[in-house]
Amino acid sequence: MLALHEQYPERYPVLLDSSAAGRPLGRFTLLLAGPEGRLLLDQDRRLHGEGNGDHFCDRLDAWWQRERGPAPPAPWPFAGGWFLYLGYELASEVEPSLRLPPSPLPVVALAWRMRAALLHDHSSGATTILAEPGAAGVAERLRSDLQAIGPAPGPGPIGAAGAIVEDEPEQYLEACRAALAHIAAGDVYQANLARCWRAPAPEGVTPAKLYARLRAANPGAFSGIAGFDDVAILSSSPERLVRVSGRRIDTRPIAGTRPRLASGDAASIAELTASAKERAEHVMLIDLERNDLGRLCEPGSVRVDEFMAVESYAHVHHIVSNVCGQLRDDVTPGAVIRALFPGGTITGCPKVRCMQLIGDLEGKGRGAYTGAMGYLALDGSLDLNILIRTMTVRGGEVELRAGAGIVADSDPLHELDETRAKARGVLRALGSTG
């Protein structure tokens, strides 16, 4: 699938990939095909493309209502619909009172019509091509391209990416201390602060080749690569923002992190699960997500069906829970985005005040980082990740970010170390040995 994306990016611009083998959450990989119309929100907050109206989510809902159709055949999740990219600064539309720094990317949000897909089921090993009515030609072209394509790019060595420049540590420590002052004053309870790394893109290396290295160095259940408007988004995210399947909705918050150590996992996991700080932060964010789902769901249907499980990834251990509910019949995809975006685990609590504080303390737009990407199917099903463990390639430069949640008893130096642990796998894709 990655080979098709690399060779024919105009026909197959998006791969939604589960690169974490053996994890039940990332069951399907989807190569989206047949790109057509678009709805785009630019960095000047102007809307382009499909529909009328002043808001991205409203236009998306109107477009979906016009095009909606039946669910795809079981067990497949997609047989036509939309690719969705939601940059972090879409938060300014979701919460109009926010005044955030501008996005560093030309596209803040994108809904891109896709008429077909090549899908692989990691559970059964089956692969199929599905297309919506009227898109048989797209499916036939996909079938022909699949038969003729060469091997996918592998995670082999690349030339040096050039010097990797890390944001000044003291700048981050100062932001942490400022956040702690706000917490002590009762302004917020928790705030997720991020920092940035930049490097020249490795010469002669395509985004697909770089993505192959990323998913090998840092596998994630909600990975993917998307190319549009001279930007490539490469993600190896472990975190789901939201899934809607039928009338069931799930969100899966991650909060609580420890690095994996060469000496073994047991001590690190024991410290993580015993930490009163990490447990309190996690429970607070579960409550935030329950509140978000409560705005959408039938009364009494919201519940936590997985509580504080530990998941181990290539470079870190995380505490993870799952919150689910039964959607009301009147809830639309745009309403789901408005209620849950951006994710509470990468903003803080209370969410709106935290987003304003993050903008003030970080001082620059986040772009793709802590936004979301995924699909919306014709029947209203959707699946979106949170864009963490993600790099952006644009204009010959690669940028990535990592953050940590600041709470009352945070140690700024520990939080600085946590950002480095989270960034480690992404940096290794660029050739870093740290």
Q: What is the meaning of each model-derived region?
A:
Residues 1-434:
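Extended alpha-helical targeting/anchoring segments
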